[in-house]
């Protein structure tokens, strides 16, 4: 039941996020789009902040299952959305169930493979992507046409998203909780509070995306954001055993980087996409994010379990430092791809 509820909840989140971006890019002036895309990532960071602060209290004094009820508040917003979102002309459309199925098979199998390094999921993932490629070439009414991926800028942006976003929860969900508990010998509750300033900074930076966009081009903003992400990972890798304040500062830089990157990266991805195809483009963009994040959690957790020691040393600190160096190399690869 919990898994089913989580599937429904995640589906709603993915749809809401994608539809918001589609609304912004279709109905708002181009000069305002970065501002409102920034509000989206700011809201996400703020939600993470509130989740960290309230989940412990709810789990302790009520029940962790009560957290599922929080999302019911969103039902109250439906009348407002119905009244304020402009109506659009509806057309008959074919839902490519088979194409979506192949994508789901590929994505889930790839995540399982990265988490376990078992050959069967790898084979299933390869079969899934092969069948998807065959499907879009062999049939007409598919979720996307092959020509869609001939747009070099869009494909490059998707690669950057896949690579860089895989590091997003590697730091906050794997390294920081583990380092706080096993390196600094403090509680997981402490780890949650150390993450709070990072999400707060991310929310502020996201809300200021419009102002940042007026002073920096999309390219410069993206490179600055990627630089912040890389610096955060390298800083933590070098000083992880020194003080927990290092983790706080790193998380602030890290969250600021992702918040700054979101709006200009979306804008770059769809810059050359025809207006009638932006919905599909944004859908695949968010699909890539939703694939990259669990992939990152899977390989980061696997590295932690393997007790990896890249630069010598022993103990838990050396393991988490090595994980961070791997994440830093991956983030650097994302910068190279973008360049």
Where are the language model's segments positioned?
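12-transmembrane solute porter fold
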Residues: 12, 24, 143-309, 316-339
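Interfacial loop-to-helix junctions that mark the boundaries of transmembrane helices
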Residues: 2-4, 8, 63-65, 113-124, ...
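Cytoplasmic-side transmembrane-helix entry/capping segments in multi-pass membrane proteins
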Residues: 33-43, 91-101, 147-153, 219-226
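Helix-loop-helix hairpins in multi-pass membrane proteins, especially solute transporters
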Residues: 1-92
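Hydrophobic transmembrane-helix bundles of small-molecule transporters
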Residues: 60-160
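Hydrophobic core positions of alpha-helical segments in small-molecule transporters
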Residues: 4-5, 17, 39, 43, ...
